[in-house]
Structures are given as structure tokens and as C-alpha cells.
Amino acid sequence: MVAQDGIAESAAVAGWSEALGELHERVGHRCVRSEARKRVKRYLLGLLGRIERKNGWRMAEAIGERDPQGVQRLLNSAKWDADAVRDDLRKYVVEHLGDQQTGVLIVDETGFLKRGEKSVGVARQYTGTAGDTVNCQVGAFLAYSSGKGAAFIDRALYLPKGWTGDPARREEAGVPEETVFRNKVELAEEMLERAFAAGVPARWVVADSFYGRLHSFREWLEARGRPYAVMVPKTNAVPLGGRKKKIEQHVERLPEDVWSEVRPAQDDGGRRPWEWACLDLAADSEKGMRRWLLVRRSTDDPEDLGFYQAYGPEGTPIEELVGVCQDRWAIEQCFAEAKGEVGMDHYEVRRWDAWHRHVTLCMLAHAFLVVVRLAAREEEEAERVGKRGISTRA
């Protein structure tokens, strides 16, 4: 991935104003009134700008408005469908980044630290963002990553039971009546189901151990014939060599000759080298699929281990499995870019619609930057190839 401080520069180099206008044409029609359509574009411009905090007053100033009332109307009361814009975003990402050979879907969550009790979904809950239990909102996200780049394509706000079971809080925050409690894994499955139904070109599903630890999640993917590579805790039990034991117990007995340094497929040389052990688990012969346990070991510290379970077509080379396992980190980069570049966590809204609208527009702005960066990179490569061709002919 390209460093964060180079993203906006890449956009400028590619002549991003015209490209942003084309993107706005894709989503502007989702707004009922022209005022909202125009303000969506200005909001995107504000998110793409270099203001330090992209909240109400700062955003209003950046887009040339006297006060934040217009921005607040766009997020809270204007008539437009954030889910329809999300679908437009997914099509945009697939159009520019889609690749059946290298595409993966990545699920993860992130926290948004908050004060008070009014913001929809806020509660004292654990988030990896803080590494602790804090007052925050938690959003589940789905990203698409390929050899061309990575961007978000879906999102879902997690509502704890303290919210779904409280009619007064729900009404005040504008939570739709049909919204019921769903745990984070169920939210991830719903997002994946939407991606599957839309035909997003992905060979694998990737997730960290929060999702991968659950047999039910892995079984859900297998029932749909979806290959996966998910992190798992060392305490998970797997059948190996006729005995079902904790992964850490199996690993303690591994001979040294099962380890080998593996460079993943699609490696650009920038990934850290690891030693890997790839162990066969049970086959799913009727579907032509197989399960594996992969163990990653640091070449510097043999005690630094990572564990993955994978399910995919028979004969999948270890280089591909290793590459897919490492693809999970692409969503971490997406979170860093979306929060650091386009203000995904800078909002001051409290209601259900406003959260989804702000986050969706941030996802759209981030995807735009990823696409512009890709175009700039491809243009630079074409120029290099052209210069080499001229030099050769000379």
C-alpha cells in the first residue's frame, strides 16, 4: 500500500476534480432534492481536503458555508438513501479494483471513541482501536482487496442489546423499527451475503480470529462454497493425525523440517518474510475442497507465531494460501487511511441515519483516492515502459 501522506498528492496529479465529478454523477441521483445533491459533492470535497478535523464547523468553513446547518441537514434530515449509495460504491470499487484472480473480501471492525450516552450504539465495550473496554461505537466493515488496491464496500453499526431493547433510546436516535439485535459475526455474514449476491469477484474471504475462532462462521462460509483463510487462536482444537487437540499442542510436536520460508503469490518484495508450516486437515472431497492449518513463525523470534485455518480448492499452492493469509492487513491500512485522510472518525452526529451517511460518504471518498492513486501509478508505469521502448529503438 502507498503511504498515507501520498494519497492526496496522487489525487492531484491525476486531475482529480474531473474524476470526482464523474463519481458524483454516480451517486447524486440518490438525493431527492438538488440542494442535497450539490451538498454531497461539497461534502466529498471537504472530506478530501486537508482540514485537520472534519467535523461540522470545520467542514462548513472548508466548503464555503457560513454555518454547519447545511451539513447537518445533509446527514440528518435530507432525503437520500445511504444504502443505495453504498451499493453504488461497491460497483465503483469492483469496476476499478475488481480482479477474480487476486480479489479477496475482508471483514473486520473498528471502534469510534465517544463521550456521553446519546450517540447511537454507544456503550462501554471492547474495541481494538483503544485496546481496552471504553465508551465507544463499533462498526463492522467489509473491504475488497486485489492486486490493484483495497477499499471498503460495506458497513454496519453494531447495536448492543442495551440499545435494541430500549424503545426510548431507539426512537431518540432514529433506529428503524425493523432493526433487531445482531452480533458482530451476524453483521459480517449479512455484508458478505450482499457482496456474494452482487457478484463481487473474490476468490477468498479473510478475517481475524474474532470471526475465525468460530466454527459456525467457518461452517457458514463452507455451506456457501466460499474459500476462506481466517486467523484462529492457538486454543482452538483441530483434528490432526487422527487426534483432535488444541492447535498449540499440535505445534509443540512439529518437526523442524515442516517449516519453510515462503514468499506469497503476488508478493512485491515488501512483505516481511516468515517461515510457514502448512498441515492438511480434513478434505471436502465431494466439493473438491480441502482444509488446512497454517502456522506462521517469525524468522527472528521462534516464539512469535500466528495461526490460520483455510478452506479452498484441492491443490491450492502454499504460496497462494500464505498470500491470502497476509491479505487481511489490507483492511487495517484502509482504516488508517479512512480515519487519517478523510475523517471517518471525526463526526459529531448521534442518529442512525447520520452515522451511516457520514461513514458511507467517507468510504466513497477513500475509494476515490484509492482509484485515483491506481490511475496515477498505471500512468507512471506506462510512461516508464514508453521511455524504455524509445531507448531500445534508439
Tell where the protein language model's regions lie, with residue ranges.
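Intrinsically disordered or highly flexible coil/loop and linker segments, enriched in small
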Residues: 29, 33, 53, 201, ...
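Buried hydrophobic packing segments
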Residues: 142, 191, 338, 364-368
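Catalytic-loop motifs flanking and including active-site residues across diverse enzymes
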Residues: 138, 330, 334, 357-363
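Conserved, well-structured functional cores that handle cations and Mg-NTP chemistry
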Residues: 2-206, 210-227, 234
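Short amphipathic alpha-helical "interface-anchor" segments enriched in bulky aromatics
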Residues: 107-111, 211, 252, 263, ...
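Basic, amphipathic alpha-helical segments enriched in Lys/Arg and hydrophobic/aromatic residues
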Residues: 342-394
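An anionic, glycine-rich sequence signature occurring as long contiguous blocks
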Residues: 4, 21, 147-173, 177, ...
